[in-house]
């Protein structure tokens, strides 16, 4: 039993520590992200509201029960004198009691709207538009979450690559430190040279500590974004330099116009404004409804007998507001103003989309050029470091020359790696700008 428990614990630990790939992170963010889950609940609420609005167009069945007690009873006096009759002495005029003190009524009613001027239909369409707007909002949040996942993943790649470069730099410096100490013991260099190399080594170690801290923070941010119980180390991948082929800018802009969820949201807002105006105009018309009821009560229609009886009623109800201080007209005007505002917002959004696509495209082009230049610089710095190291062994170059060459080589390698990361981030920006990053 203990062995089984140990195996389960080891298996759970290995799963928790398994490397997180980009594809898995994108899948987890769609499944687990709390913002997306909250938006899904909002979408369900909108769907339920649509079902409620549709139900208002159907017949409604109501049941009611009433029981009351009256301390007075209506009486109907019989006019004896008018009938030509006379009452004996000491007799009061006869009367008929209508009903009794206790009144009870059970009713089952059916109500059906007949004409509302299009109010109910507009309300259903407005609710359905709200559902589509929530779906569009969910798509937008999915794209934003996917972009955050891309950004964190590539930031993690940058830190991992930088750490390797810093570790290689540290190894070179440690070799130089050993050589400097050997030369110092042989009285060929001063203590200053050894101290200079040692200080540079400490600088790189501090950078490695900061890199480790930054990687831990990236893991924490990724776990929060993916709603994971524990952090998982992000897998390291090989970043391939870009090829020479680039996407056509006009094609990217056309894709953005087709797929950006913000545009769909604006157009759904315009449709909602049109429906709101239509709904406000519908209040100019009367509401007509039919109603039928089945009653069982005491007293019934025959108040004189005061007995239990059943009966039915059927009728129509007309309600027409004739004056409301221009409230309906102002609602129509408000809907028209909202429609005009959304039209302007659409124009602004189109400009912003155009800018987003061009910005991502320019950033990608700039990153490609930076990669090419950084690659040449890295090769030159590698050759320079090799030459200076050889010259130092021959006694031509100083320790300071080697440290400067090593630092320049490290910076060139970091520049090349950062340019490569910037290219991949620019590609993510393009995917976000054209609305296809979550696909």
Model-derived segments and their meaning:
Residues 64-109, 237-246, 278, 291-324:
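Small/polar, glycine/serine/threonine/aspartate-rich low-complexity segments that form flexible
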Residues 3-12:
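Sec-dependent N-terminal signal peptides
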Residues 16-66, 72, 114, 188, ...:
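Bacterial Sec-pathway N-terminal export signals of envelope proteins
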Residues 37-41, 54-55, 98-100, 114-142, ...:
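Sec/SRP-type N-terminal targeting helices
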Residues 41, 174, 203-228, 378-436:
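Short segments within alpha-helical structural elements
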Residues 48, 138-255, 360-363, 367, ...:
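Periplasmic alpha-helical coiled-coil/stalk elements that build and connect Gram-negative outer-membrane
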